[in-house]
């Protein structure tokens, strides 16, 4: 019997490397891990594909989904709306697949109220200077937008202590190894092992 999948909430200020870490984690398309594809009203960035990176919808469509109680969580960030499909998450977890939510602290608080057992991971940059360097290096945003993101980052990072784990993304490979360690450790909990190896445990303890 396979254990129910774990729900991982991964949050970070923009530029901390959250999306890159999740992409690296799933690059080999593991069958037991899946990132949740959120709905958003923001415009696609260069290279982003609808249905793969996000489900891009209009504000009217998004509000209709909220009215239908279709979202596990939703939040407004920088004037854009983001939401996670409730049914998709539940169905995926029931198959024993770990799901990763790439969401901010507001969304994390909503998820924790519904599913307290969700595991929170917060990614931090090694310094403000490095965070600004990464944002500038993207070449996607104006100086005004970067300044706004830096100001927002301080607010976001103040919520790090609401999470179960914290990773400092100074060295990318080490940060990725840390993330993998967190994931695999959750599969070795007593509850997970009981579900996965129930028959074996019953046999071992039989008279």
Swiss-Prot record:
It catalyses: GMP + ATP = GDP + ADP. GO terms for molecular function: ATP binding; guanylate kinase activity. It is an enzyme of class 2 (transferase). Its EC number is 2.7.4.8. Its main location: cytoplasm. Residues 5-184 form the Guanylate kinase-like domain. Signal peptide: none annotated. It is found in: Cytoplasm. Belongs to the guanylate kinase family. Essential for recycling GMP and indirectly, cGMP. This is Guanylate kinase. It comes from Shewanella denitrificans (strain OS217 / ATCC BAA-1090 / DSM 15013). The gene is gmk.
């Amino acid at each position: 019997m396979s254990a129910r999948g774990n729900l991982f909430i991964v949050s970070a200020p923009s530029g901390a490397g959250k999306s890159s870490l999740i992409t690296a984690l799933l690059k080999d398309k593991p069958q037991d891990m899946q990132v949740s594809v959120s709905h958003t009203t923001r415009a696609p960035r260069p290279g982003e594909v609808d249905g793969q990176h996000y489900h891009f919808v209009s504000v009217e469509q998004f509000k209709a989904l909220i009215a239908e109680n279709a979202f596990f969580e939703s939040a407004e960030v920088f004037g854009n709306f983001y939401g996670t499909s409730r049914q998709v998450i539940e169905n995926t977890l029931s198959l024993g697949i770990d799901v990763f939510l790439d969401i901010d602290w507001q969304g994390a608080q909503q998820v924790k109220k519904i599913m307290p057992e969700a595991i929170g991971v917060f990614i931090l940059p090694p310094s403000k200077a490095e965070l600004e360097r990464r944002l500038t290096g993207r070449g996607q945003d104006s100086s005004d937008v970067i300044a706004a993101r830096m100001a927002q980052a301080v607010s976001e990072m103040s919520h790090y202590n609401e999470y179960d784990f914290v990773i400092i993304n100074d060295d990318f490979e080490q940060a990725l190894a840390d993330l993998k360690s967190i994931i695999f450790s959750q599969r070795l909990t007593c509850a997970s092992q009981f579900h996965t190896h129930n028959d074996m445990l019953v046999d071992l303890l039989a008279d």
